[in-house]
């Protein structure tokens, strides 16, 4: 019987990390279904949804410390039950810019209050090329539940912009399902 698990990996970034982890999983007959990886200042973080026969996933759990040691990573494996996709309207992309990191808390508080799920989140901090001020940037992929009006959300975010001196951009995300395929040859 197939089972699913979530594997997280943390360690020093290096060339070949993704291949080494994929090879270790393939050798144990474990499939990678979904994954995210990022490198931050020389450190690497991976989160991987895996699938395999229950015995193979159990074996992976038993060998986790040895695999992690050989890769130079701290590994953690958690069995998961697949949940239904978040129900909601078409996804939105939110970008927010702030002179201080506390602005993001105000944005996420609005999203939480409205029952909006953050599907993907990235933040960055960078210095302005013409001043020494640090600007914080947040990018989030959102799923808005049917109970939340996008117009109401937009109004609330505009009010937050003015009150907290933020810059917030909210736009729909085009899906591949809404775009017709582009022919590559004559008809």
Task: Give names to the regions the model predicted.
Residues 1-187:
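A conserved regulatory-domain signal marking ACT and ACT-like small-molecule sensing domains
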């Amino acid at each position: 019987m197939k089972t699913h698990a979530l594997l997280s990996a943390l360690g020093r970034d290096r060339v070949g990390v993704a291949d080494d982890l994929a090879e270790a999983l393939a050798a144990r007959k474990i499939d990678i279904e979904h994954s995210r990886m990022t490198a931050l200042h020389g450190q690497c973080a991976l989160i991987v949804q895996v699938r395999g026969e229950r015995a193979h996933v159990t074996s992976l759990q038993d060998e986790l410390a040895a695999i992690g040691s050989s890769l130079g990573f701290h590994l953690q494996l958690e069995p998961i039950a697949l949940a239904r996709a978040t129900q909601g309207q078409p996804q939105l992309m939110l970008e927010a810019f702030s002179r201080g990191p506390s602005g993001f808390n105000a944005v996420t508080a609005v999203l939480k209050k409205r029952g909006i799920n953050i599907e993907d989140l990235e933040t960055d901090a960078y210095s302005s090329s013409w001043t020494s001020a640090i600007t914080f940037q947040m990018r989030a992929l959102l799923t808005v539940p049917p109970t939340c009006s996008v117009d109401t959300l937009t109004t609330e975010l505009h009010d937050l912009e003015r009150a907290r001196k933020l810059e917030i951009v909210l736009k729909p995300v085009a899906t591949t399902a809404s775009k017709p395929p582009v022919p590559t040859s004559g008809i």
